[in-house]
Amino acid sequence: MTTLAIDIGGTKLAAALIDNNLRISQRRELPTPASKTPDALREALKALVEPLRAEARQVAIASTGIIQEGMLLALNPHNLGGLLHFPLVQTLEAIAGLPTLAVNDAQAAAWAEYHALPDDIRDMVFITVSTGVGGGVVCDGKLLTGKGGLAGHLGHTLADPHGPVCGCGRVGCVEAIASGRGMAAAARDDLAGCDAKTLFIRAGEGHQQARHLVSQSAQVIARMIADVKATTDCQCVVIGGSVGLAEGYLEQVRAFLMQEPAPYHVALSAARYRHDAGLLGAALLAQGDTL
């Protein structure tokens, strides 16, 4: 059965057709609308989906935010241009005329990456470092979503009680410091206004402030991973997202993690499916692969 998979992120929307063998075809992307209105997101999704829907039999959505009974609830509204509530499943069913499933994007990506691991791995955590910071937890071969859909939102754990206010309302969240948006917000002087991609470029050129911002992000993520190891005793952690997959970033995270006491060390690897992990995980779940 062909699935029309959609990934809704803070900076881009992606869609593709995925068959039962996880082959991807006709991948398309659009920028996530900056408008705070539901109509803007609805129209962007319609433009993304219309060319693909005739060949699909179902829709699977991986979206940033919390998914509750088909509704998209933004824990950090800044990641979706201020959007707080959006009837995601209802909207896509109306656009595509197909049965629709929705799941958090990091949870979906965790499920895809779990399937790429050796069979003896039953406990893993996926962490995405991108516009925001998210995660997905697989425990004893089962994806944890939680009754309220909050499971795996690791970016909203505490990094610094004196840190910046996060869009979720807490102070000093991992996401507020380590995410691409958090790094950009902390940039000063000649880096003010630069996005995360530019900060990585400048860091590669030796710019001291840019190098500090990248290093600080990696250290915060490493400390969070130590907390995750203590909480879940996972066998491995997989890192994805535009920041997480940036050149040299994983190596910095690994170096900082090795500075933690040995019980908190855990194997780290880059996401095998890279930026397609959310699409593939959502398709797997829609196809009934829930173990």
UniProtKB/Swiss-Prot annotation:
ATP binds at residues 5-12, 132-139. GO terms for molecular function: ATP binding; N-acylmannosamine kinase activity; zinc ion binding. Its EC number is 2.7.1.60. Gene3D superfamilies: 3.30.420.40. Pathway: Amino-sugar metabolism; N-acetylneuraminate degradation; D-fructose 6-phosphate from N-acetylneuraminate: step 2/5. Keywords: ATP-binding, Carbohydrate metabolism, Kinase, Metal-binding, Nucleotide-binding, Transferase, Zinc. PROSITE patterns: ROK. One of its GO terms (biological process) is N-acetylneuraminate catabolic process. Zn(2+) binds at H156, C166, C168, C173. It comes from the Bacteria. It catalyses: an N-acyl-D-mannosamine + ATP = an N-acyl-D-mannosamine 6-phosphate + ADP + H(+). Homodimer. Catalyzes the phosphorylation of N-acetylmannosamine (ManNAc) to ManNAc-6-P. Belongs to the ROK (NagC/XylR) family. NanK subfamily. This is N-acetylmannosamine kinase. It comes from Salmonella typhimurium (strain LT2 / SGSC1412 / ATCC 700720). The gene is nanK.
